Amino acid sequence: MARKTVSRKRKAAAASAAGPGGLYGEQYGWDHSVHKRKRLPPVKRSLVYYLKEREFHLGTLNKVFASQWLNHRQVVCGTKCNTLFVVDVQTGQITKIPILKDREPGMVNQQGCGIHAIELNPSRTLLATGGDNPNSLAIYRLPTLDPVCVGDDGHKDWIFSIAWISDTMAVSGSRDGSMGLWEVTEDVLSKSDSRHNLSQVPVYAHITHRALKDIPKENTNPDNCKVRALAFNNKNKELGAVSLDGYFHLWKAEHTLSKLLSTKLPYCRENVCLAYGQEWSVYAVGSQAHVSFLDPRQPSHNVKSVCSKERGSGIRSVSFYEHIITVGTGHGSLLFYDIRAQRFLDERPPRACYGQKQKLGGSEILKLTTGKGWLNHDETWRNYFSEINFFPNAVYTHCYDSSGTKLFVAGGPLPSGLHGNYAGLWS
């Protein structure tokens, strides 16, 4: 029988179209009415099976909470010890960035919080993160990372999350239960440029919020209405917010913030991360042991959830890249969920892959595990944890580069009293 051949050009074209999820045949749309879709047999192995880890040494920094790629070789990170730094993934070099202070920096006395969020605007010309005061919003210009301004008169508690809703407007979500809308005007930007030209010392403006809205508190304990995570739907100009009382809130977010709805989440413990999949029109919400997929246009009983099988450690980070949802856990695991096939990647990996396999509902799923990192054997460790030989590093943050072939992963030990760090490049 004649052998069927495929030209190398066609093979190359097909391979170039695959992201980290690889090729899975024809793409199916998400069925919003019943949340069911045909399970697709993979026809090509996902790229994530071939990822290998290279750890970075971060010295004595404590727990990396946030990260974003700046370009093909630099990642900016924020830590629990309130350090903002850039790591060069080719050389491993660490460069610390000065953090921005309030008008009255002497009033800041909040240890143990740090930088929980870093976000780039759509044009990648501005970066928003926390300031020296964890209640304040700091804006830097890219690619230089020159300071632009600080929003220091809004929140009364730590900023947990940030989302850009346009090139000049960002929203911050705080532990005080409020969401602040901030605008970086042309006037602020031009004055920032002129100040840098006149001064060799970093100078920056102080801005006030354009709007400050509290999330609804009528159905729950007001003390637990902390805004933990934000994600923006640019197509509909809608902002999703998750609060620690187990609710999802949706806001219209353009020139101001207008509440659209609030709904109780099916799994409402430790809802600390949120991502939006534009192609799928769903929000992914992480909880103690589940990832829930929420379409605000559908009834709440249509919410689909999948279990990570790592109970107790929590889902600490979640992201969309094409049809693959990457899940970082408190046990130091990276799991990969195929939203088209509606299952975790579970085919037997090739011999050359770097990863472990874990049982899930009778089948095997791919689980990549973070490396050893660094742990401070301080007094807390000696008094309470010295008999435990190994602590997994919680995946507090992860992000793909623009090509989808490099995955930066960072975090640290899960117990709040332990001091340590982990950062690695999987490629």
Swiss-Prot record:
Per the UniProt record, the source organism is Gallus gallus (Chicken)
PROSITE patterns registered for this protein in UniProt: WD_REPEATS_1, WD_REPEATS_2, WD_REPEATS_REGION
State where the protein is found. Answer: Cytoplasm; Cytoplasm, Cytoskeleton, Microtubule organizing center, Centrosome; Nucleus
Q: Which family does it belong to?
A: Belongs to the WD repeat DCAF12 family.
Keywords from UniProt, A to Z, are: Cytoplasm, Cytoskeleton, Nucleus, Repeat, Ubl conjugation pathway, WD repeat
Q: Which GO terms describe its cellular component?
A: centrosome; Cul4-RING E3 ubiquitin ligase complex; cytoplasm; nucleus
Q: What is this protein called?
A: DDB1- and CUL4-associated factor 12
Please list the residue ranges covered by the WD repeats: 110-150, 154-192, 222-261, 310-347
From what superkingdom does this record's organism come? Eukaryota
Instruction: Please give the SMART domains that the UniProt record associates with this protein.
Output: WD40
Q: How does it assemble?
A: Component of the DCX(DCAF12) E3 ubiquitin ligase complex, at least composed of CUL4 (CUL4A or CUL4B), DDB1, DCAF12 and RBX1.
Q: Which GO terms describe its biological process?
A: protein ubiquitination; regulation of autophagy; ubiquitin-dependent protein catabolic process via the C-end degron rule pathway
Q: Which InterPro entries match?
A: Beta-prop_DCAF12, DCAF12, WD40/YVTN_repeat-like_dom_sf, WD40_repeat_CS, WD40_repeat_dom_sf, WD40_rpt
Pathway(s): Protein modification; protein ubiquitination
Coiled-coil annotation: which residues? Answer: none
Pfam families in the cross-refs: Beta-prop_DCAF12
| GO terms, molecular function | ubiquitin-like ligase-substrate adaptor activity
What residue stretch is flagged as signal peptide? none
Q: According to its UniProt entry, what is the function of this protein?
A: Substrate-recognition component of a DCX (DDB1-CUL4-X-box) E3 ubiquitin-protein ligase complex of the DesCEND (destruction via C-end degrons) pathway, which recognizes a C-degron located at the extreme C terminus of target proteins, leading to their ubiquitination and degradation. The C-degron recognized by the DesCEND pathway is usually a motif of less than ten residues and can be present in full-length proteins, truncated proteins or proteolytically cleaved forms.
